[in-house]
């Protein structure tokens, strides 16, 4: 994981696709070491506990943070009346209301009844610094063993990453190291971490379907919930300007062509001595702790009924995957993609990302 002070990012894709029914069981969080991924329970005892505490929300994940609430990503949607389930004992809890954060991509869901205390995951408290280790859970697409190649520096060609696989549903995990924080605009402050070829066999990157999964940071002897998976990019590349468009997990997109401009064109990203890895983003929870606390500590029955009725009046999720388009090089920024029920991609304004510094 490179801990560079400044990134030049080329846009990103919201890590979302709806798999609410009949998804096959494949690997999820993509890792360097194997196309099979880490689909078994982590060996670390604390992470093994978190593995069982996190529930399946459709074909995504949800994390209980209070007796009556679990947290996930807002953009994946859902419907009141659906249930979160826990594979370790097949327990299930029906949702009765949802609360969506107006200032981030977070959504809290209220359940009927209560989670046992053993299900509730503690929140990470405080700030973060570049270099802190992360553990990521998700249920996204796997990678394949098919290598993407591009121009090497100063000459020749070299491997750049792997093509994505197809269907996914099984949860898996990976590790990474925080590079810094990104300004996601309406999506909130984002934990940013890249896909480093030298990061070790468990080095992880998000893929479509990992949205809503948790990110943990070790604090005071326990793994605290620090983030909720949001996005990753760049993804769509070409090996030649007229070649097929590929979707890949990239530890170096230098020497490949990225989509840019309107009308669409493909631009070669110069190969350099240093790799240019894709970056994953997870919504950082600490800046939204006041909103979270306000929701989970004020269960007003009248307000609950109004919120439930309002949500049921909106269209339900069941939308097709949105496919990102990399619009242009945005130094020290990233492109925020809108979330609509229209399956065609749409791009919102670019939001400034501050320089990322070690502390």
Residue ranges and their predicted role:
Residues 27-54, 58-77, 168-173, 204-297:
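C-terminal subregion of chymotrypsin/trypsin-like serine protease catalytic domains
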Residues 19-27:
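Sec/Tat signal peptide C-region and signal peptidase I cleavage site
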Residues 8, 24, 326-329:
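Cysteine-centered motifs
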Residues 300-318:
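A short, hydrophobic C-terminal helix/tail in secreted or cell-surface proteins
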Residues 66-67, 71-104, 114, 129, ...:
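Catalytic-histidine neighborhood of serine endopeptidases
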């Amino acid at each position: 994981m490179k801990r560079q002070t400044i990134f030049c990012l080329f846009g990103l894709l919201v890590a979302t696709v709806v798999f609410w029914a009949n998804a096959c069981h494949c690997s999820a969080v993509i890792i360097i070491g194997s196309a099979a991924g880490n689909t078994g329970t982590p060996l670390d005892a604390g992470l093994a506990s978190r593995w069982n505490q996190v529930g399946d929300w459709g074909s995504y994940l949800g994390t209980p943070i209070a007796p009556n609430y679990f947290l996930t990503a807002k953009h994946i949607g859902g419907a009141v009346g659906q249930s979160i389930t826990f594979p370790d004992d097949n327990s299930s809890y029906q949702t009765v209301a949802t609360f969506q954060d107006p200032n981030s991509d977070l959504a809290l869901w209220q359940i009927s009844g209560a989670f046992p205390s053993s299900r509730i995951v503690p929140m990470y408290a405080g700030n973060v610094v570049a270099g802190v280790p992360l553990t990521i859970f998700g249920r996204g697409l796997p990678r394949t063993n098919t290598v993407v190649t591009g121009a090497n520096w100063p000459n020749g060609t070299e491997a750049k990453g792997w093509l994505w696989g197809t269907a996914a549903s099984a949860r898996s995990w990976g590790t990474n190291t925080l590079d810094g924080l990104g300004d996601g605009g309406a999506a909130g402050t984002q934990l940013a971490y890249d896909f480093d070829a030298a990061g070790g066999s468990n080095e992880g990157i998000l893929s479509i379907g990992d949205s809503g999964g948790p990110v943990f940071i070790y604090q005071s002897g326990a793994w605290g919930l620090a983030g909720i998976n949001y996005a990753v990019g760049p993804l769509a590349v070409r090996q030649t300007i007229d070649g097929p468009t590929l979707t890949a997990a990239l530890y170096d997109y230098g020497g490949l062509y990225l989509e840019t401009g309107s009308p669409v064109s493909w631009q070669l990203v110069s190969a350099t001595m240093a790799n240019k890895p894709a970056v994953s983003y997870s919504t950082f929870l600490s800046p939204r702790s006041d909103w979270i606390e306000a929701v989970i500590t004020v269960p007003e029955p009248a307000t609950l009924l109004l919120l439930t009725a309002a949500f049921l009046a909106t269209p339900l999720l069941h939308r097709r995957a949105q496919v990102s388009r990399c619009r242009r090089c945005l130094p020290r920024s990233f492109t925020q993609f809108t979330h609509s029920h229209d399956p065609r991609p749409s791009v919102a304004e670019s939001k400034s990302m501050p320089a990322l510094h070690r502390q």
